[in-house]
Amino acid sequence: MRTIIYTLILSCICCLATVAQCGNFAGADYSQGIVFIMENNRIVWQHKAPASNDIWVLPNGNLLFSTGKGVLEVTRQNDTVFHYASESPIFACQRLKNGNTFIGECNAGRLLEVSPEGNIVSDICILPEGISDGTFAFMRNARKLDNGHYLVAHYGDECVKEYDQAGKVVWQVKIPGGPHSVIRLRDGHTLVAVADKTQNPRIVELDKQGKTVWEISNKDIPGKPLKFLGGMQYFPDGRLLFTNWVGHVNPEQRNHLFLVDREKNILCTVENREGIQTMSSVFSLDENGKSYH
């Protein structure tokens, strides 16, 4: 009996140690309509954020996140610093180096740059000619790149496209399963988090020609826990932090967050956590160096 109890205690300690390696992070819980901060394995802060799909921790400690049909920047004291409201669903936001905020409006098909005062200073429409509503599946995550172009995940069309400042497509690649999140890396490669349309959720790294050079999927993880891959963050040493959204399947075993290395070793997971229903995006609080999100 003592041996059994000792084994159970040791297993729990090992489990907690693994979770602790994920460190402190901010997350978006799509199903609960909140964003939150987890520190030392406890949720210490949260804020209302309906259908949130994108979150950043800014250098000043404030949080920038999408709120269904808006974007909000707040302090840890819940003071509003920036707010943008839209009639279109929004899945993407990004604070730019010039202090403006990039916003991707889904149905409207607009790539916006908004000043700190809330004024639209750049507006690029990427809807096909003759279309006034791209529908809810038109766009998910999007990013403004250092070269001034825009990288957009077209969930419905199952492709990723890069647009120039005039809204012209300069690069594209098909992504069976539907892309949700995109990251352009320093070497020009592109990371894409893929959803569940083909029942093959995965993250792929593509070179400049669109060829897959790295991939992680359920083939690499025992138990096939991946359901729908969402927001992610890539670190210079090759580690990748990514969310596994479980809202379409509602499984008993909820694996919300993974941290893996280039060899596809699982460094930590966050699973079955009280206070979390479905995670759609994440941003580490522990990484002070350059990362890609």
For each predicted feature, which ranges?
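Bacterial N-terminal signal peptides
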Residues: 6-17
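Histidine-/acidic-rich catalytic cores in large beta-rich domains
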Residues: 21-293
